[in-house]
Amino acid sequence: NLGCPSKKVQKNKFGACLIKEPDLVADCINSMVQNCKIPVTAKTRIGFDNIETFEYLNAFVKKISEAGCKTVILHARRAILKGLTPKENLKIPKLNYPMVYKIKDSNKDLEIILNGGITNTDQIIEHLNKCDGVMIGRAIYQNPYFLAEIEKRIFENTKIPTRSEIAEKLVEYVK
């Protein structure tokens, strides 16, 4: 995870501050790829502080892909490393979906998954036309049934249980 901008995380050299150190990130990914039997993925922001250029991000993505990372999740906001809280970093930096699309266009061999600000199924469908996938966080945290709505919209023939049916099943587990 190369996306968290919190001070505590930065102090320990984790999260979004690592976007500034592509060689170190590539070394870490290479080591994980060499020592793991599962795919190694990276989730990152599209930039940091005043750096939000296609050239920088594309070079970063290429460097980590050369190290063995074949799936990159891009949070479509830059990380402001000083002056904003992690919560503010989820809202104040503007979303830049076209940057993610451009990275996908330039890296056809990589799986590029878009993250950030996705709140409805229309957005998901739009993003899926330009990226390999989407990652949704807060919208599902706030409304877990959103997953059922997505399933119904994307896979139209799927039978989705109602909230009442889900609650009945949950009661069985609680017992």
What are these regions (language model features)?
Residues 1-2, 172:
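Proteins with a high burden of low-complexity, intrinsically disordered sequence enriched in S/T/G/P/A and R
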Residues 2-14, 22-111:
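Alpha/beta enzyme core
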Residues 5, 14-15, 136, 146:
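Glycine-rich, flexible loop/turn motifs
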Residues 19:
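Aromatic- and acidic-residue-enriched carbohydrate-binding clefts of CAZyme catalytic domains
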Residues 35-39, 50, 54-71, 98-114, ...:
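Alpha/beta catalytic cores of nucleotide-metabolism and tRNA/nucleoside-modifying enzymes
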